[in-house]
Structures are given as structure tokens and as C-alpha cells.
């Protein structure tokens, strides 16, 4: 799709934005656009790209836990693993982010989980012949990640 640079310039000038502001925002936009990533200026802009109301997007952020159904499955070696499955509205947003952003970011070779085109066999090959393998299961991993951490991770892209 590409960032509509000329349309942005016309609109920014019509809104009397300073040359410095326009230059900074174009630099930001060009950095993302050249990587094939969508340009997102703020939550309002993201909601526009997602074809949803801004208030709905804000509600996802404010009370994310309310957009998941919870259930448990048995672990191989006893105990239960809590599963959080997003309802369709949130899943649609997550899918858009995955397809339009995350799938376009090249992952380091050692990242295999959830990396497009990588398999569990590739992960196993990296450990072949090793004397020790450390297996870690971090309790409540996804729940422990806050909005600020997500913002910082995406900002670095």
C-alpha cells in the first residue's frame, strides 16, 4: 500500500504544521515505509487503519482481560496450564498486527517459535549434540507484559 506521502504533506501544510514537525513526522513515516511497515502515528490513526472506532480500541487497551475467554488444559507432567483465547474482536486486531507488522520483521535465526516459515525441527537442530538444554516455562508470561513494554518494542521498529 505505501504511505501516502504527498497526501500527508498537503494535509499537514493545510493544518499549518511547522516545517520541523512535518520533517520529523515524514522521517518517522519514511523509516517505516521503506521496511514495508504501516505508518501509525497514534491510537486514532491505528483505529482508522483497523476500520474500528477509537473508543473500541481504547477499551481493548483499558480492559484487555475482558476480551479473552479462559480455560485450562492439563500439563504433560501434572498441573494445569491456563489458556487465554481472545474473542473475535480482539483476535481480528491481533491478526492485523501480526500480518501487517510482525510477519514483516525479520527475526534472528535463533527465534523459531511463532516465526513465519520456521519449524519445531529447526529449533531442535539448534540443540543437537548439546550436553545440556535449559527448558523454561515462565508463569503468566503474557499477562506480565504491560502496555508500556509493547509501546517501546513497537517504537524500536
Kindly give the residue locations of the regions a language model identified.
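Short, conserved non-catalytic motifs in the polymerase core
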Residues: 71-94, 113
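Glycine-rich, acidic/polar active-site loops that bind/position phosphate-bearing ligands
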Residues: 140-157
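Active-site-proximal segment of RNA-dependent polymerases
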Residues: 90-140
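Generic solvent-exposed, charged/amphipathic alpha-helical segments
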Residues: 47, 94, 98-102, 151, ...
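Nucleotide/phosphate-binding site architecture used for ATP/NTP-dependent chemistry
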Residues: 39-43, 48, 81, 88, ...
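Reverse-transcriptase-like RNA-dependent polymerase core
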Residues: 57-76, 157
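Non-catalytic, polymerase-adjacent accessory regions of viral genome-replication enzymes
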Residues: 1-58, 64-66
Amino acid at each position: 500500500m505505501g504511505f501516502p506521502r504527498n497526501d500527508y504533506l498537503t494535509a499537514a501544510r493545510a493544518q499549518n504544521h511547522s516545517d520541523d514537525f512535518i520533517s520529523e513526522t515524514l522521517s518517522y513515516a519514511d523509516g517505516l515505509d521503506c521496511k514495508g511497515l504501516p505508518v501509525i502515528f497514534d491510537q486514532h490513526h491505528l483505529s482508522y487503519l483497523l476500520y474500528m472506532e477509537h473508543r473500541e480500541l481504547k477499551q481493548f487497551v483499558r480492559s484487555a482481560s475482558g476480551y479473552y475467554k479462559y480455560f485450562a488444559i492439563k500439563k504433560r507432567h501434572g498441573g494445569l496450564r491456563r489458556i487465554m483465547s481472545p474473542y473475535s474482536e480482539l483476535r481480528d486486531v491481533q491478526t492485523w498486527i501480526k500480518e501487517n507488522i510482525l510477519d514483516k520483521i525479520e527475526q534472528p535465526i535463533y527465534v523459531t517459535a511463532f516465526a513465519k516459515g520456521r519449524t519445531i525441527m529447526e529449533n531442535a537442530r539448534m540443540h543437537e549434540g548439546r550436553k545440556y538444554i535449559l527448558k523454561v516455562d515462565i508463569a503468566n508470561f503474557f499477562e506480565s507484559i504491560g502496555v508500556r513494554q509493547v509501546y517501546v518494542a513497537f517504537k524500536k521498529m
